Regions:
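Short acidic loop-to-helix transition motifs that present clustered carboxylates
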Residues: 265-271, 465, 570, 592-594
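Short glycine-biased active-site loop of nucleotidyltransferases that positions the nucleotide triphosphate
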Residues: 218, 274-276, 340, 469-473, ...
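Active-site nucleotide/adenylate-binding loops and adjacent lid/helix of ATP-dependent enzymes
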Residues: 226-391, 439-440
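ATP-dependent carboxylate activation and anion-phosphoryl transfer catalytic cores
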Residues: 2-198, 345-347, 353-360, 364, ...
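Conserved N-proximal alpha/beta basic substrate-recognition cap immediately N-terminal to
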Residues: 140-277, 290, 526-527
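Extended, charge-rich helix/loop segments that form flexible
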Residues: 368-429
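Glycine-rich phosphate-binding P-loop
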Residues: 518-539
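ATP-dependent carboxylate-amine ligase catalytic core
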Residues: 535-683
């Protein structure tokens, strides 16, 4: 056995599309047939995968979510030179070069773990190997079920192809497909994954809620839920208000914040009239937009106004999005910046520059784009890359035309040619961290505006000639405000140090591990009668603990009243810990549910073991550092309480009233446990 630890409306639309993908399922729908075993008879396969099972949380094998499967290697694999196989694997997965696998299942697990981490180094680390008769059982940490299953078959087919060159196998193509499928999964969005990882790194419980299509951090009354940075604790009306660009503009102007003058129009003629009233240059943009789509800047003539208006209408027709009007506003000159607040406090500032190429006097613009995409290692179609690939589309061609250029133009040596009007990072724009140089007055402006909204993550897009100068010095204008903005860009700027905004957001809610948790007691044979007695004791210790949840063989009970019993044990645990009023939780996990479902939650303050079998004994691994194990010895007539290091006390066991004896044994430790969590509230 081995156990190894090795954005604006645009933002809202992005969140909406992400949520629609997730609706009703924790898996992305895609065809993965090409990744599954080939149609050859299974008896002819050299690496056979069987009995794949997924646990959504801690289980008998691992202290976290795990995919478990049996694997069998044919004699041909066993007889193949092991070192040759290792070197072939390491060639494709160079991060494994310094690993020292001791046998085939170890090598398979290491390769699979590296595939599951992908090129983006996902935060997964553990696997466990055991022997099951002639087969091996491998348990490995995972995020998305379909991606993990397909990755397992990928590695099995890969091993098969490495020892049998006649078997065709395109590793690079299949690995790329795995990564693309992960990007489409519920875990794959850069912002949501960064928040998941930020929680896990801080030992904050993180679980996916498949029915809701969102994630939960923390338990019970300490929990928050959401997708991307749109969270249940945010004000729904405030979040909605930020999607109305025209109303936001009026509000900011009323408050005296620097916002360009403008108006919302609903036809081409009025747009032209408003532009003439404001004076050129002007900007046209849709009231409801996405990632700069439909935005036209630097408009200098009435003809260009009509063209920009028609482009917006065409965009709505093409995408099927609802037309809510067009904003015509004064043009503000300056560099594009994203200013971010977390919990009302300034967090980060990013300067964004539109995609461009630098001329060499030899190549034309189309060739320069290809050279930039091919040679700049920071550019990738991976959504987590600091720079996206530059894509040539109609927007690029039209903007070049305004500059009296086209794709065949050969720029002068050293000439900088911008390809887009808008500094869109996902379209090849460049991001630069300017958090350290922003003027204090601009920081105060961010916090002043954020203070009007009950929104945790709040972004302000501004144009400023120099962000290190105060906003009232001129050349500064607020373009729009955003609730639920993307925050991954701050973790991976193209220039400058990263700012851990996901970590800031987690720290805002959970300054300590205890602020994410509630008291939890688990056991292998807890009765409803014991839970009801415990509830009375807890309320006696702290009358504020008003909502008590228990899970026994009878099902879920809240405050002693039966609530429901789901056929799946892990769903029962999830339902109970999902309750936003839950103060205290007690759960019974016996051998059958541990094998079939795992226990879902992580960490416990007290583990109560009553004649445990080998599976139930695994509950001890969930004991928190300050926790206790309570052993009931029926044959000796005693109850022993232990911490992580030693025995603390023994109590006599009344066989006729076991529940009362058990409650007496744990009662001395309950006040400190309750106080630990009650003194660490979650921030709002």
């Amino acid at each position: 056995m081995e156990n190894l630890e090795n954005q604006s409306t645009s933002e809202q639309e992005a969140i909406k599309s992400e949520t629609e993908r997730a609706n009703g399922s924790n898996q992305v729908a895609f065809s993965s047939e090409e990744l599954k075993p080939s149609p050859r008879d299974i008896t002819q396969r050299n690496v056979v995968i069987k009995k794949i099972k997924f646990y959504t949380g801690p289980n008998y094998y691992l202290d976290r979510a795990a995919m478990v499967f049996n694997i069998n290697f044919s004699p041909l694999v066993k007889e193949f030179d092991f070192q040759t196989l290792c070197q072939s694997i390491f060639k494709k997965l160079p991060k494994l070069k310094n690993s020292k696998p001791k046998d085939l299942p170890d090598l398979f697990s290491l390769a699979l773990l590296e595939i599951l981490r992908m090129d983006i180094d996902l935060f997964i680390h553990k696997f466990y190997i055991s022997v099951d008769n002639e087969e091996y059982t491998i348990a490995i940490e995972y995020l998305d079920e379909l991606v993990a299953e397909d990755a397992t078959y990928l590695v099995a087919d890969w091993f098969d192809a490495l020892i049998n060159p006649k078997v065709p196998f395109n590793f690079d193509g299949k690995f790329k497909r795995i990564q693309e499928d992960f990007d489409k999964s519920d875990f794959g969005g850069p912002t949501i994954y960064s928040l998941i990882e930020a929680g896990l790194k801080r030992n904050i419980p993180v679980n996916f809620l498949p029915i809701e299509g969102q994630f939960q951090w923390g338990y019970g009354k300490k929990s928050i839920r959401g997708r991307s940075t749109v969270l249940d604790v945010d004000g729904i009306k405030d979040t909605e208000f930020t999607t109305f660009k025209d109303s936001c503009k009026e509000f900011l102007l009323a408050c005296g914040f620097p916002t360009p003058q403008g108006a919302t129009v609903y036809d081409e003629e009025t747009a032209e009239e408003e532009a003439l009233r404001l004076g050129f240059p002007v900007v046209l943009k849709p009231v409801a937009g996405h990632k700069g789509q439909g935005v036209t800047t630097g408009i200098m003539t009435a003809e260009q106004v009509r063209y920009a208006y028609q482009a917006i209408m065409l965009h709505h027709q093409t995408t099927g999005s609802e037309f809510q009007g067009v904003i015509v506003e004064q043009m503000v000159f300056g560099k594009d910046h994203r200013l971010l607040a977390v919990g009302g406090k300034f967090a980060a500032a990013l300067e964004r520059e539109p995609a461009y190429v630098i001329g060499d006097g030899v190549h034309n613009i189309k060739q320069l784009v290809k050279i930039e995409n091919d040679t700049n290692e920071d550019r990738s179609n991976n959504s987590r890359a600091p720079l996206a690939k530059i894509v040539i589309d109609d927007d690029v061609k039209n903007f070049l035309k305004l500059q009296s250029k086209d794709l065949k133009t050969v720029p002068l040596d050293g000439e900088k040619v911008y390809l887009r009007r808008v500094a869109n990072i996902s379209a090849g724009g460049l991001s630069k961290n300017v958090t350290d140089i922003i003027h204090p007055k601009n920081v105060k402006m961010v916090e002043d505006i954020a203070s009007f909204f009950r929104v945790t993550a709040f972004a302000i897009d501004v144009l400023a000639e120099d962000i290190s100068k105060p906003w009232d010095a001129g050349n500064f204008g607020i373009i729009e405000i955003n609730a639920g903005p993307g925050i991954f860009m701050h973790l991976a700027p193209a220039v400058g140090k990263p700012i851990d905004v996901p970590g800031m957001l987690m720290q805002h809610f959970y300054p300590s591990v205890e602020s994410a948790r509630i008291p939890i007691i688990i056991g292998n044979n807890l009765s409803l009668n014991f839970c009801n007695q415990l509830q009375k004791k807890v309320k006696e210790i702290n009358p504020k603990m008003k909502f008590f949840g228990s899970l026994t063989e009878e099902g879920i009970s809240f405050n002693g009243s039966f609530f429901t019993k789901h056929p799946k044990h892990d769903w029962n645990v999830a339902i109970m810990l999902r309750h936003i009023g839950l103060d205290f939780a007690v759960m019974s996990h016996n051998r059958d549910v541990i094998h079939d479902f795992g226990i879902y939650h992580s960490g416990t303050d007290i583990v109560i073991l009553d004649k445990p079998n080998y599976a139930e004994r695994s509950l001890e691994s969930e004991m928190l550092p300050h926790g206790y194990v309570v052993e009931i010895y029926n044959d000796k007539g005693i109850i022993e309480v232990l911490d992580a290091k030693k025995s603390l006390a023994t109590y006599s066991l009344d066989s006729n009233n076991k529940e009362a004896s058990l409650l007496k044994a744990i009662s001395p430790y309950l006040p400190a446990i309750i106080e630990r969590y009650e003194n660490a509230p979650r921030n709002s």
